Amino acid sequence: MNPAFKFCPSCATPLALITQSEDGGDKARLRCPACGFTHWNNPTPVLAAVIEYQGKVLLAQNAAWPGKMFALITGFMEAGETPEGGVSREIKEETNLSTDALKLIGVYDFQRMNQIIIAYHAVCHGEVRLSPELVDYRLFEPESVKCWPAGTGYALAEWLKSRGHTPQFVEFPKRDS
């Protein structure tokens, strides 16, 4: 449930958690008691790219991230575009690279962010020029790149397996409970 969604976009009445009968039975959702609007809270489609550039894997560091984490190029689909068109657009916007070939790696749920990740392998060319949202990039040999145990890290692992590599995962320090 997205707690940030508090008011009806149709009439501005505060939303309430209201249980109603739906096709699958009774379901509690944020609904407008005044006009009946339902906030479905559907997952958001996110596009991700394992970029193969000059025979290596390109990972980038987002300006908003703490530390030195590098990850796949990702972004949201725009209305009216296909996933393939969207991932090519994101690659161009964020790295200035042109996409020569795309192949679907897989679709992954990312429950923590209420997202569905649609991941592609993209063979790209051109001169890397990062957008302001990225601060750095690195090129990794496929056999030495490390995956992360969440979201797009699983897409990278799947692509590595398809290339005959055994994925290695970064181990994050355990948080105190």
Predicted regions and their residues:
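NUDIX/MutT-family hydrolases
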Residues: L130-K161
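A short coil-to-beta-strand element that immediately follows conserved catalytic motifs
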Residues: L17-T19, L97-G106
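Acidic, metal-coordinating catalytic segment for phosphate/diphosphate chemistry
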Residues: N2-A49
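Active-site-adjacent beta-strand/loop module that shapes the phosphate/pyrophosphate-binding cleft
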Residues: Y108-R129, P142, W159-L160
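Charged phosphate-binding loop/patch that engages nucleotide di/tri-phosphates or the phosphate backbone
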Residues: E158-S177
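Conserved Nudix-box catalytic region and its N-terminal flanking loop in Nudix hydrolases
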Residues: V46, E52-E93
